[in-house]
Amino acid sequence: MFNKRNLKWLSVLATIIMAFVQLGGALVTKTGSEDGCGSSWPLCHGALLPQNLPIDTIIELSHRAVSGLSLIVVLWLAITAWKHIGYIREVKPLAIISIAFLLVQALIGAAAVIWQQNSYVLALHFGISLISFSSVFVLMLIIFEVDKKYEADELYIRKPLRRLTWIMTGIVYLTIYTGALVRHAKASLAYGGWPLPFHDIIPHTEQDWVQFAHRGMAFITFFWIMITFIHAVKNYSENRTIRYGYTTAFILIILQVITGALSVMTNVNLFIALLHALFITILFGMIAYFIMLMLRTIRSEKIK
């Protein structure tokens, strides 16, 4: 017999596991464990469990195990949600997107191991996995009926905020890509101090340019989210969904900037680097929820 509470717990479990997939991928890259299993996939050094287990192999194996578990749990969630609450318009598309992008993410990860892709291709891996995470995250919010609790199901988002949010989505995604590129191009400590090198602000190497591009995009992202936040709070002060949602997004980008700066200042402290990945993961999940709300508004306009 179907129990809504069980579906809630399943959605929370899937969201947490997907967050660990994101953090695990960041951990693999930050610790240089990409080749921990050699060029074997799905096996590790040609075996299910190799006899020799150095730390890079353990990290890579753990990431693969969590990724495999995420596929099982997300598939379980997608099927259950489809069957029992598929009447909610967004549930079926979100279920399809979560599974599809999880599979694409796995294929890119496998290709990276087997064929050793370049940094610019590898950087797509994190962004694609974020889309899958965001789908699961939004699905969880729907299951918990956040819409009804905060009157989001009756919300009308006017065009100015929609434009600001669409542009914010593109800017944030580009920033995520450049951030992933920083990791894969081994450019975390390139381009000197933060926010700019004191001795020479002109980038010289490819790593310098990658780091420079990421900092530039981060700067644009921070100010654009701040502008969007101010507009949202000023014009939708009566609506808790907008007020709480965009305030959370602004807090997350502040934390993202702080951890980004601390990563440079601490020579990429692993804990800070993982927090950096976690904050952007949650932020993108919030943006995905904003997109769902905007699409509802657009559909309501077409009906009228």
Swiss-Prot record:
Q: Name one GO cellular component term.
A: plasma membrane
> Which compartments does it reside in?
Cell membrane
Which stretches are Cytoplasmic in the membrane topology? 1-8, 89-93, 145-163, 237-244, 292-304
Topological category with respect to the lipid bilayer: Multi-pass membrane protein
Q: Which GO terms describe its molecular function?
A: metal ion binding; oxidoreductase activity, acting on NAD(P)H, heme protein as acceptor
Nucleotide-binding listed as a keyword: no
Q: In which pathway does it act?
A: Porphyrin-containing compound metabolism; heme A biosynthesis; heme A from heme O: step 1/1
Q: Kindly state which keywords UniProt assigns to this record, in alphabetical order.
A: Cell membrane, Disulfide bond, Heme biosynthesis, Iron, Membrane, Metal-binding, Oxidoreductase, Transmembrane, Transmembrane helix
**Which superkingdom heads the taxonomic lineage of this protein's source?**
Bacteria
**UniProt cross-references to InterPro entries, sorted A to Z:** COX15/CtaA_fam, COX15/CtaA_HemeA_synthase, HemeA_Synthase_type1
Catalytic reaction(s) noted? Fe(II)-heme o + 2 A + H2O = Fe(II)-heme a + 2 AH2
Q: Which cofactors does this protein require?
A: heme b
Q: Where does heme o bind?
A: 63, 125
Q: Which residues lie on this side of the membrane: Extracellular?
A: 30-67, 115-123, 185-215, 266-270
Q: Where are the transmembrane segments?
A: 9-29, 68-88, 94-114, 124-144, 164-184, 216-236, 245-265, 271-291
- Provide the E.C. number(s) assigned to this enzyme: 1.17.99.9
Positions contributing to heme b binding: 214, 276
**Could you name the active-site residues?**
60
Q: What is known of its domains?
A: The N-half (TM1-TM4) and C-half (TM5-TM8) domains are connected by an intracellular loop. Each domain is formed from four-helix bundles and they align in a pseudo twofold symmetry manner. The N-half domain is the substrate-heme O binding domain and the C-half domain is the cofactor heme B binding domain. The cysteines of disulfide bond Cys-37 and Cys-44 may be involved in transfer of reducing equivalents from quinol in the membrane to the active site of the enzyme.
Record family assignment: Belongs to the COX15/CtaA family. Type 1 subfamily.
Task of the protein: Catalyzes the conversion of heme O to heme A by two successive hydroxylations of the methyl group at C8. The first hydroxylation forms heme I, the second hydroxylation results in an unstable dihydroxymethyl group, which spontaneously dehydrates, resulting in the formyl group of heme A.
Protein name (Swiss-Prot/TrEMBL): Heme A synthase
Species of origin reads: Staphylococcus haemolyticus (strain JCSC1435)
